[in-house]
């Protein structure tokens, strides 16, 4: 099931000041985990603010296929979970569509069950490597039948009893860390993840909220040791999902670039493992005011007031990459309008996202007149303040929602329009994007539709 069955190109044109107030859809990471942990916990979980994109809904369907009962009443999702250790073998393969997070976390969750579970996905997901999650599962006793290169379609055959392991995560990946911790939920004894570089910590925080026996210690070198005691009880919770910082990035950068704009974005997740983009834009001279910082569901949340700003190029420290890995495409757009040179390094993870995101961004920038250099793990962008001469190109999105949204943002501020070859897959993470941007005054339309 590929999104490109009927591609819908879209075009963004130079827009007047963007103004207004918006509330961003719920955070994707927390939404996936809310469905998973709610489906696994005993009793009832109630979720408000859930991101209802296709990716998250696919995770919900997978949990239903393994015994969880999920329904929606008004704005509230209500889950009756099966209880930790009580997932059922699904009758058919679990279809994750385009959702890498949903697929990888669920592999961890079900791998240590004494049952057979098959995973399938769309053309884009079937190209993405799963070995980074499968390798620790193999150490725990899980058998894997996979397509070449540890890709989907694949089947996990769980052991009678899983072995607890201590696993040092070889790359900065919250998905790998989370998959091992979730596998540890159904494993006797203590499963340990050693994380040299901290990544988003929603799994740890939320598992603790659900009652898991999970502890985190940071040693003197800054290495995190996360221990989970398996086979404990999880209890249903009430969750209000804060707004997704990765989705916030698009209207935020648009407001910075379109002259005269002032936009307020409500209820944004400000977890420090996710705010690298805001920090970087502020270093570039962005006028971003953080209003009413508060705690909601154990997470830092705030409102952002964003005003059009003259940006200047910066060197982004590579160690910041894990806290903004999904935001580099739209940062590259901001850099295209900044004075001077912006250097982004440590981007190897971008090569294994929904597309080779680094190459896709570089090609899109070149097609629209931006002077940039793509390195093996880096991207250097030399900007043109005011966007003079930029635009006029069509961007190949490679079924990647973030590439599509980033270049539509570009077209709002560039001299000439920017077209993306497909916009259908924006629905995977931000179904309201087109309507929300139009409400602020952005000129974005499906091509052929005026």
Curated annotation (Swiss-Prot):
Q: Which Pfam families match?
A: EPSP_synthase
Per the UniProt entry, the Enzyme Commission number(s) are: 2.5.1.19
Q: Where does 3-phosphoshikimate bind?
A: 28-29, 33, 173, 175, 326, 353
Entry's localization field: Cytoplasm
Q: What class of enzyme is it?
A: transferase
Q: Does the keyword Transmembrane apply?
A: no
In which pathway does this enzyme or protein participate?
A: Metabolic intermediate biosynthesis; chorismate biosynthesis; chorismate from D-erythrose 4-phosphate and phosphoenolpyruvate: step 6/7
Is Transferase one of the keywords UniProt gives this record?
yes
- Superkingdom, taxonomy of origin: Bacteria
Main localization is cytoplasm
**Molecular function terms, GO-annotated:** 3-phosphoshikimate 1-carboxyvinyltransferase activity
Binding, phosphoenolpyruvate: 28, 100, 128, 175, 357, 402
Tell me which residues this entry annotates as catalytic. Answer: 326 (proton acceptor)
* Keywords of the record: Amino-acid biosynthesis, Aromatic amino acid biosynthesis, Cytoplasm, Transferase
GO BP annotations, alphabetical order: amino acid biosynthetic process; aromatic amino acid family biosynthetic process; chorismate biosynthetic process
Enzymatic reactions: 3-phosphoshikimate + phosphoenolpyruvate = 5-O-(1-carboxyvinyl)-3-phosphoshikimate + phosphate
State the GO CC annotations: cytoplasm
> How does it associate, per the subunit comment?
Monomer.
Known function: Catalyzes the transfer of the enolpyruvyl moiety of phosphoenolpyruvate (PEP) to the 5-hydroxyl of shikimate-3-phosphate (S3P) to produce enolpyruvyl shikimate-3-phosphate and inorganic phosphate.
Q: Which family does it belong to?
A: Belongs to the EPSP synthase family.
HAMAP family linked: EPSP_synth
Checking NCBIfam families in the record gives: aroA
The identity of this protein, by name, is 3-phosphoshikimate 1-carboxyvinyltransferase
UniProt organism field:
Brucella abortus biovar 1 (strain 9-941)
The gene from which this protein is expressed is: aroA
């Amino acid at each position: 099931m590929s999104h490109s069955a009927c591609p819908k190109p879209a075009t963004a044109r130079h827009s007047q000041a963007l103004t207004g107030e918006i509330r961003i859809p719920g955070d994707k990471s927390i939404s996936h985990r809310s469905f998973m942990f709610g489906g696994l916990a005993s009793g009832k979980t109630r979720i408000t603010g859930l991101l209802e994109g296709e990716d998250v809904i696919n995770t919900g369907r997978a949990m239903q296929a393994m015994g969880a009962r999920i329904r929606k009443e008004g704005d509230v999702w209500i889950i009756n979970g099966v209880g930790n250790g009580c997932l059922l073998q699904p009758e058919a393969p679990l279809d994750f569509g385009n959702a890498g997070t949903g697929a990888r976390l669920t592999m961890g969750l079900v791998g240590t069950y004494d049952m057979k579970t098959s995973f399938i996905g769309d053309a884009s997901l079937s190209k993405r490597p799963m070995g980074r999650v499968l390798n620790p599962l193999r150490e725990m006793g899980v058998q894997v039948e996979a397509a070449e290169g540890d890709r989907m379609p694949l089947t996990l055959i769980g052991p009678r009893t899983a072995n607890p392991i201590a696993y040092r995560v070889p790359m900065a990946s919250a998905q790998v860390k989370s998959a091992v911790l979730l596998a540890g939920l159904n494993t006797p004894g203590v499963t340990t993840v050693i994380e040299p570089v901290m990544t988003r910590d929603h799994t740890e925080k939320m598992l603790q909220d659900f009652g898991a026996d999970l502890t985190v210690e940071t040693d003197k070198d800054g290495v995190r040791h996360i221990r989970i005691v398996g086979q404990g009880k999880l209890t249903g919770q009430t969750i209000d999902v804060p707004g997704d910082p990765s989705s916030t990035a698009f209207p935020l950068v648009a407001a910075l670039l379109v002259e005269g704009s002032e936009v307020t974005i409500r209820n944004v997740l400000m977890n420090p493992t996710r705010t690298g983009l805001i920090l970087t834009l502020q270093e570039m001279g962005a006028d971003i005011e953080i209003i009413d910082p508060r705690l909601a569901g154990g997470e830092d949340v705030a409102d952002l007031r964003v005003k059009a700003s003259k940006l200047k190029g910066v060197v982004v420290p590579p160690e910041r990459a894990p806290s903004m890995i999904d935001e580099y495409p739209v940062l590259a757009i901001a850099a295209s309008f900044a004075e001077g040179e912006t250097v982004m390094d440590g981007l190897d993870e971008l090569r294994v996202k929904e597309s080779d995101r680094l190459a896709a961004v570089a090609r899109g920038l070149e097609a629209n007149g931006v002077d940039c250099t793509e390195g093996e793990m880096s991207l250097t962008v030399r900007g043109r303040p005011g966007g003079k001469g930029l635009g006029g190109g069509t961007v190949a999105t490679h079924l990647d929602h973030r590439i599509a949204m980033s270049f539509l943002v570009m077209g709002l501020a560039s001299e000439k329009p920017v077209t993306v070859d497909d916009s259908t897959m924006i629905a995977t993470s931000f179904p309201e994007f087109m309507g929300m941007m139009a409400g602020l005054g952005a000129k974005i339309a499906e091509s052929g539709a005026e």
